[in-house]
């Protein structure tokens, strides 16, 4: 690859056309939006890079102290070390990634554990209708309807395109919910809280949309 092909010398740079779902292995879960004729939602444009955006910069996380907590309306509250989380059944998901700041990175391959697997293990109670994702960076949170959190293509990921997630991109583990704007895919995940009522997170408190569907351009609450 020449410098012209990758002007930023960026390992995440995509030269040429984005990966397509039909090129994926048979076991890979394909996010439905990658099969659209036009994969770029309204108001978005494709980036070949993977920009880094966050609210306050990466937190300092000692991997030996990292934990994922499953709390709230569950029959069995659970806590996982990183090794314990990675020992669960793994999935790979092929999806697109849409930032509310109007860029989209197409054709990402994630490796991790399905959110459905986690909800099953903690036995989320029937009255749970929402989740609040808690991150390690200064108490940052984001909310999701339970059905979005439990979509087949949603997971907690520790690899992107075959390599471990860097701290800048949310490593060691981040939430990935492909059919929502990317702020809903919380970096540096610390806990998942199952709730009866919706509860606005960090950006939602500032006016961002509670649902965040990119195909309906739900960027802000005023966009209702």
Please identify what each model-predicted range represents.
Residues 2-224:
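Structured, non-membrane catalytic/scaffold regions adjacent to prosthetic-group chemistry
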């Amino acid at each position: 690859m020449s410098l012209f092909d990758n002007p930023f010398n960026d390992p995440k740079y995509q030269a040429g056309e984005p990966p397509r779902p039909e090129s994926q292995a048979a076991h890979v879960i394909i996010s439905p939006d990658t099969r659209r004729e036009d994969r770029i939602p309204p108001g978005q444009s494709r980036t070949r890079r993977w920009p880094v955006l966050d609210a306050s910069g990466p937190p300092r996380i000692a991997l030996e102290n990292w934990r994922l907590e499953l709390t709230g309306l569950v029959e069995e509250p659970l806590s996982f070390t990183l090794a314990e989380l990675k020992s669960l059944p793994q999935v790979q998901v092929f999806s697109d990634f849409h930032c509310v700041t109007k860029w989209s990175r197409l054709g990402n391959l994630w490796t991790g554990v399905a959110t459905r697997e986690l909800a099953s293990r903690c036995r989320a109670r029937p009255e749970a209708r929402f989740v609040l994702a808690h991150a390690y960076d200064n108490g940052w949170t984001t909310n999701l309807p339970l059905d979005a959190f439990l979509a087949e293509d949603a997971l907690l990921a520790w690899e992107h395109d075959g390599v471990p997630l860097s701290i800048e991109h949310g490593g060691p583990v981040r939430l990935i919910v492909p059919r929502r704007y990317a702020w809903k895919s919380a970096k540096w995940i610390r806990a998942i809280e199952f709730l009866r009522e919706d509860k606005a997170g960090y950006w939602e408190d500032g006016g961002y949309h509670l649902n965040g569907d990119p195909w309906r351009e739900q960027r802000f609450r005023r966009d209702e």
